[in-house]
Amino acid sequence: MSELYGEAHRAFQDQHGTRRLADRLESLARTEFDANDRAFIESAPFFFLSTVDERGRPTVSYKGGAPGFVRVSGANELTFPIYDGNGMFLSLGNIASTAQVGLLFISFESPRRLRVQGVARVVPNDGPHHSPGAMYLVQIVASEIFVNC
């Protein structure tokens, strides 16, 4: 039983003969960050955050800052600050509603891409991960971490 793929994914994989490749990629997915992941994530000046609202509608937001603004705060946990961008609070509202998130970290120079799927929560901007000027912090517990080729 696949944790990453559902019936619709499998149907397309079978139609195009990519199930073995998909299985190989799934076998590389993990639930904890390794040292390379940590270095890549913590050096990233931006990432893309996908969230879903209570009606099932997705949205994607750019999140940027100085390298190190995203921290690997546990074996399977990320933390990043939230600042008031445009006042819409789409990401925060969606996290509060459904908690399901996807993150895509990209280096155009390397090239390297890393996907993180997980469950997020909004927490106060205090404690060990305090970020000056941030309104809140978002903590994500990763359920899947995998290279995006």
Spans of features found by a protein language model:
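Binding-site signature for planar aromatic cofactors or substrates
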Residues: 1-149
